[in-house]
Amino acid sequence: MEDKKLYTLLVYSENIAGILNQITAVFTRRQVNIESLNVSASSIPGVHKYTITAWHYDEREIIKITRQIEKKIDVVKASYYTDEQLFIREVGLYKLSTPVVLENSEISRLIRRADAQIVEVNPTYCSVVLSGMTEDITNLYYALEKFDCVLQYTRSGRIAITRSTVEQVSDFLDMQERNRLSKK
């Protein structure tokens, strides 16, 4: 059997209540688990961007999911990508015990080597943030865990932009505008 591959779907929609539920329902019906989900305003006014990751064995299933999402009336555009086609980042947040960090200088060195930043320090805890790839964020977590200093840990969902010069949604919107103008 073929190995599972991580796919990233970039979905653009109008900011309409209930569209998130409609999009996730497509995955549920096809029994595909969403690994991560990030929703935010896009660079296009009035359009929101959904970055969704899911593991699957079969690219054809991901194509079907993408097409079903794109059929939703409030969805402007949906596309799927592999990691090679995207510039990807996540954010990891770590709350560490300040007394433990102060007792062991190796923890501070580890944070600096990972290019993480200490963003808050008080007598009880210090907050650390790291922006990077999933592996970097989880590797830092496991390294810090060995020092028994982690009080809390979380990482964001993936955010991504395509490596192409123009996103497909821009081409699609330009085409829609040309069609609209040609009908006048």
Where are the predicted features?
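Long, contiguous binding/interaction regions
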Residues: 1-49, 56-184
